[in-house]
From Swiss-Prot:
Coiled coil: none annotated. It comes from Shewanella putrefaciens (strain CN-32 / ATCC BAA-453). This is 3-ketoacyl-CoA thiolase. GO terms for cellular component: cytoplasm. The active site is at C91 (acyl-thioester intermediate), H343 (proton acceptor), C373 (proton acceptor). Gene3D superfamilies: 3.40.47.10. The keyword Lipid metabolism applies. Catalyzes the final step of fatty acid oxidation in which acetyl-CoA is released and the CoA ester of a fatty acid two carbons shorter is formed. HAMAP family: FadA.
Amino acid sequence: MKQAVIVDCIRTPMGRSKAGVFRNVRAETLSAELMKGLLLRNPQLDPNLIEDVIWGCVQQTLEQGFNIARNASLLAGIPKTAGAVTVNRLCGSSMDAIHQAARAIMTGMGDTFIIGGVEHMGHVPMSHGVDFHPGLANNVAKASGMMGLTAEMLGKLHGITREQQDAFAVRSHQRAYAATVEGRFAKEIYGIEGHDANGALIKVLQDEVIRPETTMESLAALRPVFDPVNGTVTAGTSSALSDGASAMLIMEESKARALGLPIRARIRSMAVAGCDAAIMGYGPVPATQKALARAGITVADLDVIELNEAFAAQSLPCVKDLGLADVVDDKINLNGGAIALGHPLGCSGARISTTLINLMEDKDATLGLATMCIGLGQGIATVFERV
């Protein structure tokens, strides 16, 4: 079987969704700039070799509608001979794009793919136009479409306290801020034009949503937002609302080597799994277990892990049941996570994978895992191996 490898991976800075730096920048532009960036960073690649552009996006309407993958690829000047498709596995969309490209390469259906994802949550809110079929209530809990309430349920089932959630959130902001100050995001962030608070055009080079001033005391003052009476999940322990995109150049290994392109990581295994929609945040557990089994390794073999932080109340049960509670500070989300950086839905899968690969390089690590939960009860996971 042919091998799929990551040649390059980049992301935009994460912009605040409410009056943030990308308030005047469209989702197609965020996407197109990264597509162009991959080609500029890898001049050995003839763009005419691109088989397909596979782009994750959840809210496929307004500026994100009508196949944003094709719209953005045309905007970027990708040759018209390349295909383009937009995929939607909710929060796991751009990780699913990774999987689709990898499967195509492994089965000989192409050897050069640009993948990624985008979500401009300031322009197209998560709830825009959502209309669940009333019959779903016959099969799943009525609150299953309310992500915050699923986090409340999962946290309660696993005895996760408010204090544990607050501490996890503080850690996310501290780690992300330290990574910013120390330049650890510099290799993955691709500067995009935006506007400052006064409306001046600027090159955005850093994430906007990190709150380094976050403390246990400031979080303790916040009220539960999803279950005001009995809940523990607050805005501060939930992923921030942000706008952003991420992108990867994925190729067949021998083709990349023939062109003299760098091989940053190999895709070792992939998996998706389902779980009860009422505790959708638990999805990373069965998905990770599948991916590890397919790779022929155990969780102890992993050097670095990126677990998408949809909610602290969701992440902590996954950490516990994957047997990772004792290695959080050594292996998991070492540069912070979505609580600090935000979770632009269609962007996040390739974003956490990009961060993971950079961390693996920084730490000279061999094996890494990127995994995330998905609304309505799914999980997705990818094991990467440096070569």
